[in-house]
């Protein structure tokens, strides 16, 4: 008897789901918000004055199981300072054809320079377009930030940056550049 009721019970499940309302998502017209901790596109963060947080240590590249990250560090100079430390990431590439979105690179970063955003629309018809360079990964400049290279904020050290005590604002002009004079004689 149970031999005959088994298939009927299976058809009962199928029959009951036939009359349920379909859960249709109207993507891409209506985009549903992602979870706050969603692993989307990577972002290279900046300090409050615009200097880059990446110190070019290459720990993210070593931690990546898919070998999707390439970092080449370089030394900062007093003339060209990209980060508050001795080094910065001169070349930074993430190959999204290889990235598996695991987030191990985020955990490996000692300065929290690398985070993941909620952006997930990265499709491209060109394979080369899915290799993101540093210019596409850097966080956009906010108000009060100055694009690097520029000197550190006056009176601060690299430790002040790492502790988070540096606030936004442009670094003062160097002594080599003359300051603008607001007198009427300077205007054409």
Curated annotation (Swiss-Prot):
Reactions catalysed according to its record: a quinone + NADH + 5 H(+)(in) = a quinol + NAD(+) + 4 H(+)(out)
Pfam families tied to this protein: Fer4_7
Keywords associated with the record: 4Fe-4S, Cell membrane, Iron, Iron-sulfur, Membrane, Metal-binding, NAD, Quinone, Repeat, Translocase, Ubiquinone
One GO term describing the cellular component: plasma membrane
Names of the cofactor(s): [4Fe-4S] cluster
Disordered: region residues: 144-188
Positions that bind [4Fe-4S] cluster 2: 64, 99, 102, 105
Cellular localization per UniProt: Cell membrane
Record note on cofactor: Binds 2 [4Fe-4S] clusters per subunit.
Entry membrane topology: Peripheral membrane protein
Gene3D superfamilies attached to this UniProt entry: 3.30.70.3270
Iron found in the keyword field: yes
Domain 4Fe-4S ferredoxin-type residue range list: 44-74, 90-119
Sequence similarity: Belongs to the complex I 23 kDa subunit family.
Subunit relationships: NDH-1 is composed of 14 different subunits. Subunits NuoA, H, J, K, L, M, N constitute the membrane sector of the complex.
The protein's name: NADH-quinone oxidoreductase subunit I
Source species: Rhodococcus opacus (strain B4)
């Amino acid at each position: 008897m149970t031999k005959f009721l088994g298939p009927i019970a299976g058809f009962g499940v199928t029959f009951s789901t036939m009359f349920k309302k379909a859960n249709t998502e109207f993507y891409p017209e209506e985009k549903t918000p992602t979870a706050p901790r969603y692993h989307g596109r990577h972002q290279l963060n900046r300090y409050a004055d615009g200097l880059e947080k990446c110190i070019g240590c290459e720990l993210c590249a070593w931690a990546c199981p898919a070998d999707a990250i390439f970092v080449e560090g370089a030394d900062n100079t007093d003339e060209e300072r990209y980060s508050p430390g001795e080094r910065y990431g001169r070349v930074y590439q993430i190959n999204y054809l290889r990235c598996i979105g695991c987030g191990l690179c985020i955990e490996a970063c000692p300065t929290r320079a690398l985070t993941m955003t909620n952006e997930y629309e990265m499709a491209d018809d060109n394979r080369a377009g899915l290799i993101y360079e540093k210019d596409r990964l850097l966080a956009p400049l906010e108000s009060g930030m100055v694009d690097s290279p520029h000197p550190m904020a006056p009176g601060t050290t690299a430790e002040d940056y790492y502790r988070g005590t540096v606030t936004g604002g442009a670094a003062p002009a160097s002594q080599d550049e003359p300051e603008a004079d607001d007198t009427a004689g300077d205007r054409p």
